[in-house]
Structures are given as structure tokens and as C-alpha cells.
């Protein structure tokens, strides 16, 4: 039996366990937020399904689905500090990318790019939290 872990937790563990990477001089300066992303939970209104998982009066999970019922976008506040810190991007219902604010400063510092929703193709990280990507690890595509 295969047990699946929540994607965010498993991917963060993989990133922190990984060594090496590409030097900052070879990386783009920053990655801007997508137009739909917001750290403020109040921004998730029209078109979003929201949930207050700990009943504190603040939304800490938001998901947008398409007409077929597939996820399109997702945002979560895992530490429940009132700000979204984990963002998921789907294409045709398959997870393509995850962006994480790992130190909860309302700035993305980990980017994870996936293939087929489960295989990590590449990850990037801002290790000193200055808004500039410092490390990148890219993995080759395996024959399927």
C-alpha cells in the first residue's frame, strides 16, 4: 500500500534535505506573485471556496475549481497566523507548481515545479529571505 503525504510537507522536506544547487549569479533576481495570489485571506472572495479550519474567524484555506470540479488554484495558511503561506497552481486538475512562504514573512521563498503532479522537476529557494533566488536544483526528466 502506498501512503501519500500532503504535498507541501513532503516537498519542503525534500528541499531541506537536498544539497548543492546553482549559484545566485546564474539565477533571475525574483519571481513576482501571480495576479491571483494574496497573503491576505480577505482577497479570496468571488469564485473561491473558503474555509476557516480552526474557527477563529479568519479564512485559512481557499480553493478555486473549474466547471468540471478540478482544482485550478489553492491557497492555505498552514501556521494559522492570518496570512496565506502556501500556494498551489493546477493545470487540468494536475498540480504544476507550489510556492511557499516558509518563514511566514509574506514573501515567497520556495518555488517547486512538478511534472505530472508528483515528480519534482526543479525547485528554487531564497535562502536568506531577501527576495532574490539563491539556490536552484533541477532534475532530469525520466523516461516513462
Where are these regions (language model features)?
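Bacterial N-terminal signal peptides that target proteins for export
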Residues: 1-9
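N-terminal targeting/docking segments
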Residues: 3-4, 18-22
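Bacterial N-terminal signal peptides
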Residues: 8-18
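Calcium-binding acidic motifs and repeat modules
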Residues: 20-144
